[in-house]
Amino acid sequence: MTQATQLPAGENPVKNMTDLVTEIALALVDDPDSVVVEAIAEGDCTVIRLRVSPSDVGKVIGKQGRTARSMRTILSAASMKLKHRFSLDIVEMGDPSS
């Protein structure tokens, strides 16, 4: 038996996901003022770009990428429920390539 998931009226899944990533990142970093999260629509996917200070990149990525992988797993699970694909990019603040 499959049940359709519907968002309450007025819910914005992109804002909810950016808020989620922001809260997780703020709990991990030493410099919360440097955390910037933005959503970029790319076709059928929304890229959540997380910018943190250079000293906090390692904390957000974690040993062997475990923390970043966990954040991506959470996004993936929520993506399935929302029926919209999200991906997470973690970039260093001031990185000219982003």
Model segments located where?
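RNA-contacting regions in translation and RNA-metabolism proteins
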Residues: 1-57, 69-98
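Glycine-centered tight-turn and secondary-structure capping sites
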Residues: 61-65
